Amino acid sequence: MKTNLLAILSIIGLLSIISACSSSKGHQGKGNIFESEWGLVSVKAVTPTDSLLIANNDNTATLEVLSDGTVKGSTSCNIFEGQVALNGYNLKFGNIVSTQLSCYDSTVEAAFYSMLDSTDNYTVDHGHLLLKKGNKVLAQFTPLNMR
């Protein structure tokens, strides 16, 4: 009896270890855009060079896509809201309205709004939200708070 119990406990322990290892690799591929409020990590600049702008960590730009078809967030200076049309992993932002505060450096804000205008699909890769146009990544976000 002790041998059977020990064998069962060993198998359960082994399965737990295997399960923990496979889940720690992260999720690569498509995922749920509604899981979090997302904080901007980087965004492509609005320049011919397509340089990458790194977000200011002091006041993070945010994005939140809601299941009712709305989007809201902050560019780190101004707040915005609008609509989002989702069809699978294809999406289109539209009717974006925002406050019009005068910002010290509007480089990231201009790139952020350009990204919203250009995005046509998304991927969630290892917990990061990637907004893309075709296969080109326009912006990367990290979850700020999971729901």
Regions found by a protein language model. Give the residues of each.
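Lipid interaction determinants
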Residues: 3-6, 21-147
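Bacterial N-terminal signal peptides
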Residues: 8-17
